[in-house]
Amino acid sequence: MLSADNSLDPLLKRPFSLFRRLDKDIQILYRVVGKLTNILKDKKPDDILEIIGPLGNGFPVIKGKARPILIGGGIGSAPLFSLAETIKHKKPIFFIGAKTKKEILYTYALKSIGINPIISTDDGTLGQKGFVTDMLKVFLTHHSSPITDYCIYACGPRLMLKELTLLSGKFNLKGYIALEENMACGVGACLSCVVNTKNGFKRVCKEGPVFPMEEIKWDAD
């Protein structure tokens, strides 16, 4: 959770995912869409921000031979880069989707760690035209078999994650999704970020934001 120093507008901190961990620093990737991000874009080196975190859990690194498939939708791609760096030795397959070319993020950084992403845009301005889940379906249709094991990691719009969960079920794949929800307190007290799961309501800021994809009750949306 992050806010600009000495600012009461916006009053509440906003949740941001961790883009990259460095030796003594962290990087946050954001899109300028509201009051806080408009303040952030004008910040300079040595300016002060107020941060509470880290909150909740992260993506688990699965042991074994399963090859990771990472799927990011729009700004939801941000938290997947740190994971990609961590598991690059497992040769992850990375799908990135967005509405248009200008919303495709950090492909240069992925290539610098040896990952060439599979890109799709809704309008066809970069990569294949269509939804990122359509690209994944084509890939799995041609590469999935009883002797091939994949593990899904994803973050993005809820509609994308819902479709991804259904698609993964058809191919008998397991995986993890990071949910993007509005938060007020970030410590589990206000319950503004609860989601319905097969094990009852859970707080994204405490029990999440990462959940096994099959745990979320999408029909409750």
Q: Each predicted region: which residue ranges?
A:
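A generic structural signal for residues embedded in beta-strands
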Residues: 1-4, 51, 195
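Ferredoxin-reductase
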Residues: 1-45
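Short, surface-exposed secondary-structure boundary micro-motifs
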Residues: 5-7, 54, 198
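Short, Lys/Arg- and Gly-enriched loop/turn segments at beta-strand edges
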Residues: 7-16, 56-63, 205
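FNR/FR-type flavoprotein reductase catalytic core
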Residues: 35-143, 147-180
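Local cysteine-cluster metal-coordination motifs and their immediate loop/turn environment
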Residues: 79, 158-159, 180-209
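Short Fe-S-cluster ligation motifs
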Residues: 203-221
